[in-house]
A protein has these predicted regions:
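A membrane-interface helix-boundary motif in multi-pass transporters
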Residues: 1-9, 196-215
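Structural signature of the two symmetry-related core transmembrane helices
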Residues: 116-131
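Short amphipathic helix-loop junctions that connect adjacent transmembrane helices
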Residues: 70-87
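Juxtamembrane intracellular "pre-TM" segments in multi-pass secondary transporters
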Residues: 23-56
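Multi-pass alpha-helical transporter architecture, strongest
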Residues: 10-21, 209-229
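Helix-to-loop junctions at the C-terminal end of transmembrane segments
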Residues: 101-113
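Helix-loop junctions at membrane interfaces in 12-TM secondary transporters
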Residues: 133-145
Length: 229
């Protein structure tokens, strides 16, 4: 109960600067917008444009990440018998490592480019997730889970940098709307795949591999995009 209150308070406090500083813009009428056709032009021109492929790739690896975050706690309790206290400690540890990773990733983003950061982060998450699958010690699980969290921060920030660079100023609102939608539209997919595979196989380890599969497909799609930066 207390956590919900503090999260709401945190959200309110850090929304105030945006509410104060955001510029007012005129709202266009429906006849001026042609919203659907504008969105279509944004992602499709005789085939999927670069931004369209990126949004699909991002949707898939975001689903994989969502499955890891949502189902990771269930996996930890079911396979490694973590207590509630240990689970909370792991959550705090992974959040701290994600923040550290985001700071480090921001520095290397300027040096290497956003696409390389996303690719390296995906590889880091995939490899650490595979190591988690084959871990039979609670200590190794905690180590690999913390490493996993280290790459979650950079991939989220770098993905936003990529989409902002791909959009011209007048397309920013539509583009980020699609970006947000691509991360939420199929957010159920990862957990459903993990749950279904776990139920069919009778193994949480095998079920968890569905999240890794989504990450790999998203990574392969990224390789199709040239000059992403």
């Amino acid at each position: 109960r207390a956590i919900s209150f503090f999260v709401s308070l945190w959200f309110l406090i850090f929304s105030i600067p945006l509410l104060i500083s955001a510029k007012k813009t005129l709202i266009q009428t429906k006849s001026e917008i042609g919203l659907f056709s504008q969105i279509q032009k944004l992602v499709w021109d005789r085939g999927l444009k670069k931004i369209g492929i990126f949004l699909i790739a991002r949707m898939l690896y975001a689903d994989g990440l969502n499955a890891i975050i949502v189902m990771g706690g269930i996996f930890a309790v079911g396979v490694f018998q973590l207590s509630i206290k240990e689970l909370l400690q792991l959550s705090i540890l992974m959040n701290i490592s994600a923040v550290i990773g985001a700071i480090i990733g921001g520095y290397f983003n300027d040096l290497l480019g956003s696409k390389k950061i996303i690719v390296l982060s995906l590889l880091g998450i995939i490899i650490s997730s595979i190591l988690i699958l084959f871990s039979f010690s609670k200590m190794y699980f905690l180590i690999f889970a913390t490493i996993n969290g280290l790459f979650i921060g950079p991939i989220q920030s770098a993905s936003r940098v990529v989409i902002s660079k791909m959009l011209i100023n007048e397309d920013q609102s539509k583009g980020f709307g699609l970006f947000a939608t691509s991360g939420k539209l199929t957010s159920f997919l990862g957990p459903v795949l993990v749950s279904t595979l776990t139920f069919v196989s009778g193994s949480q380890r095998i079920g968890f591999s569905a999240a890794i599969f989504l990450l790999i497909i998203g990574l392969l799609l990224l390789f199709r995009i040239k000059n992403l930066d």
